[in-house]
């Protein structure tokens, strides 16, 4: 009998393969054909275009085990995960599909036969729901399959509108739709709950295990239901639910996959209570996090990356709650790969990347988690009422990186609500402040709405004879532009490239007889192109013909930098891994800047490998080929689409040999050899999970290398060495400096000891206690600690306060022998003195330090020590 999750997966796919279905691999968790979806959340997602008639496959029957994530957006199960028996962020959906092949009778028969004959589920434990008016399905279930009428349940429009029902599926407001049949399993009367359609249906006794959707209508905009010419079938069965039934347990968290993950988590953290809900949360979250990273999503502050970050941080918080002191989450990946079997092949290939990304994110969050929890705990302990205010929510989010749902999770455990509306208000205020701070002047051009279209000829031409079709001055449409005025000129066609995809807009000239307009920038305004600049001489009018001339040198240098970003992107993916994806770029004539997803600093050896790889491709002198094609065709060819970019149905594909293929509308060199040379100038992090490389090409790269060589030569001269020996000579000098610093420190200690011998005699006695207060002008502040220690040893039982002023700053130290700390505390004493010199400080009862900014008040401040001590000793 099939019992393990892996056995069930294999049995399902084999059953449908034996019945003429094509086994199709699970698609990525990042949807490639549906921009409306955050994550793949159903088996039919990858077949959406097939159902819509926009795509054709070489098969009409398919079966899959699809990885799915529901966290964020419309389908968000995150809040319930760990607290219920069946909510997950990650799950596998078993499914079979018919694209105009079989319909209701076969779909029903396939499902029933698999459940009752292959899995041998008791028929009396199964009941079926159908849409209220779907008599065809009712007859098939009762007459063909033999389900008793008492186990058939009709469900009507129970969601407030026509065809708004649990048993009527719709892709959207219009398009394919149809009734569905759901098969439920009865876990037994020892569990509370009622059959579907009853008031107790939300209980856990009757659990839906299989949904069979009959796509038989095409819903029109006016609501009319027209029959589809080729009805189709979409089914889904959660593998975790059927595994629970086959393994004789009620909760999904008791099945083999979760039992092993929970046990491993408990072992790593050192927990003995395996029923703890935090273990369930962690076991669920490692699945979604690991598979999302394997599919190219990296933790970030936006979009899919932010949802991933929220899930990781929720898991880390629950680990902290269980007592985890060190990074633990990433250590679950090997166990996950083991328990997922064939479903983890892609995860196994990216295991190292997944573990590094999880560890980096966990360690980063751990640094602020403890402090944030202290703030939250304090706020909850002092809370008046049962709702945490929005300002505190915002502070935790803004300062400590606590997603709102993580804070809500903590509050939920204490039966406390959260003021999400107040949080959103605080967020809105911050956005307004940021916008106001950045708004140094009105940008009228950004507000332009231009009802015109400009054709682009700049891929092949840098000159043209366009006509003026619109003029704007100070954001307003005008008929004429006069000399000296700044303006936006709109042409019917142009060789000027408008800023897009990270490439800056072209510069150049628009001229005619007696007319010179200097183009300082070129921008898009919808389908129109605006040439921004100043009219140097003459007059511009609508309808006027001009000569457009792009600055050839600037365009050429920009093209070098744009083409090399494609090579850089491909090289980074080869050296660092396929998880690397572009997050932003800037390409101008001087340099290029490339932002990309990666979880740690790039090692010098990796940077060198990337640079060498790019220069190798430059030397190979690949021809740059461009082609227009359908976006789906481009993706099939392996073209990289940049996340966040919007593409038309027809796209431009730029290919460089067999090394790089990307969707790109920018301008490029003819061959990679034109780039000449590529040199990385810097690499650094700009956000969690996002790195930035800056680089130069061509003549700029040669100039950079010459500049570096000049600095090396100068350093060699200073070290009286040749360039090749600079590192060795510099290391020797640094070693010498370290030794001198050590000698100096020892000398200071000796001087402090000698000085302490002289000063010890200056101590006064107050109520039987020795007190020494000294202002030491000119002494190095770093020597105060050693001097104070020496004086303590000599005076044995004493109170010591030393102060020095240097470079406009005051440094103070107070020392109290241990036998006196119950009466006089060094921290309180030094804080009292510091407040009189414009500073503050504190420390332990026996030793404390402080600083100040008013050296002119130091003597008077030290004079206050004796009466202060006298008061505490009396």
From Swiss-Prot:
It catalyses: tRNA(Ala) + L-alanine + ATP = L-alanyl-tRNA(Ala) + AMP + diphosphate. GO terms for cellular component: cytosol. It comes from the Bacteria. Keywords: Aminoacyl-tRNA synthetase, ATP-binding, Cytoplasm, Ligase, Metal-binding, Nucleotide-binding, Protein biosynthesis, RNA-binding, tRNA-binding, Zinc. Belongs to the class-II aminoacyl-tRNA synthetase family. Binds 1 zinc ion per subunit. Consists of three domains; the N-terminal catalytic domain, the editing domain and the C-terminal C-Ala domain. The editing domain removes incorrectly charged amino acids, while the C-Ala domain, along with tRNA(Ala), serves as a bridge to cooperatively bring together the editing and aminoacylation centers thus stimulating deacylation of misacylated tRNAs. Zn(2+) binds at residues 562, 566, 664, 668. It is found in: Cytoplasm. GO terms for molecular function: alanine-tRNA ligase activity; aminoacyl-tRNA deacylase activity; ATP binding; tRNA binding; zinc ion binding. The lineage of its organism: Bacteria, Pseudomonadati, Pseudomonadota, Gammaproteobacteria, Alteromonadales. Catalyzes the attachment of alanine to tRNA(Ala) in a two-step reaction: alanine is first activated by ATP to form Ala-AMP and then transferred to the acceptor end of tRNA(Ala). Also edits incorrectly charged Ser-tRNA(Ala) and Gly-tRNA(Ala) via its editing domain. The gene is alaS. Its cofactor is Zn(2+). It is an enzyme of class 6 (ligase). PANTHER family: ALANINE--TRNA LIGASE, CYTOPLASMIC, ALANYL-TRNA SYNTHETASE. GO terms for biological process: alanyl-tRNA aminoacylation; negative regulation of DNA-templated transcription. Its EC number is 6.1.1.7. This is Alanine--tRNA ligase.
